[in-house]
Amino acid sequence: MLEQEENGLFEIPDYEHVEDETFPPFPPPGSPERDPAEAEPDEGSGAPVPVPPKRIVKRNIPKLDATRLTSERGLPALRHVFDKTKFKGKGHEAEDLKTLIRHMEHWAHRLFPKLQFEDFIDRVENLGNKKEVQTCLKRIRLDLPIVHEDFVNNNDEVEETNSLDAAATGFDAFVTSSSDSKRFASEASRNLTEEQQQRIEKNKQLALERRQAKLLSNSQSLENDVTVEESSTGENQEESNGLISADGPHDVPSASTQEEGQLEAEETQLDHPNLD
């Protein structure tokens, strides 16, 4: 510790008369104490230094082959390329052809960007003879699953059908339970007491009597309506007969005049037989 003087200053030690610390010298370059990795090659010796071989990483260059053509971005993707495109139809054939070629170029670029569209078409024509490509085209025409997504969609459809079957079985169980409940209700009705059965029979008889009374009242009202209609029709017939009788004498003179004319003609023929 530094001692504090009277005037408040510290006493500084004398470093001039202190000896420096001695360190050991560095070892020579080829000494065994030194790490061989740190040793530098001796240029004057002329010995050949072995050079480690470089590691060459081989990268798989993508090729447009049958497996790539039948992948998800290959021929199966053509099924949905033209889903959102609308062709104009007759009179616009050139525009429709341009849109078709543009979509095909986009599909070819996504599948294999290195080739131009013309070279891509030539390569696809050559690959059309491969068995894998032909089977893929057949599956597309027959609407069979090709990609993993198609199999997943089929599994979803199977699950939906299974759920429908489960719902149907549940409905059948509900129907059977309802039939069981009806059977239990019939058994419970059998187990009714005699007093309850007598009350039920009395209620049935009262309901039948009320129904018969209603039927009788309805039949009486119908008979009354029929009699009223018959009386009204009889009065109408009497009135019509009276009118006919009143009109009859007017027709009698016409008939009598005709008879008188015929008699006069016969008398003239008898009085003048030689006129003919």
Curated annotation (Swiss-Prot):
One Pfam entry name: Swi3
Phosphothreonine PTM sites in chain numbering: T233
Biased composition (Polar residues): 217-243
Coiled-coil stretches: none
Subcellular localization(s) per the UniProt record: Cytoplasm; Nucleus
GO BP annotation list: cell cycle phase transition; cell division; DNA damage checkpoint signaling; DNA replication checkpoint signaling; mitotic intra-S DNA damage checkpoint signaling; positive regulation of cell population proliferation; replication fork arrest; replication fork processing
Broad class of where this protein is predominantly found: cytoplasm
Transmembrane segments: none
Protein family (similarity comment): Belongs to the CSM3 family.
Quaternary structure note: Interacts with TIMELESS, which impairs TIMELESS self-association (via N-terminus). Associates with the MCM2-7 complex. Interacts with RPA2, PRDX2.
Protein function: Plays an important role in the control of DNA replication and the maintenance of replication fork stability. Important for cell survival after DNA damage or replication stress. May be specifically required for the ATR-CHEK1 pathway in the replication checkpoint induced by hydroxyurea or ultraviolet light. Forms a complex with TIMELESS and this complex regulates DNA replication processes under both normal and stress conditions, stabilizes replication forks and influences both CHEK1 phosphorylation and the intra-S phase checkpoint in response to genotoxic stress.
Protein name as it appears in the record: TIMELESS-interacting protein
Species of the source: Rattus norvegicus (Rat)
Gene assigned in the entry: Tipin
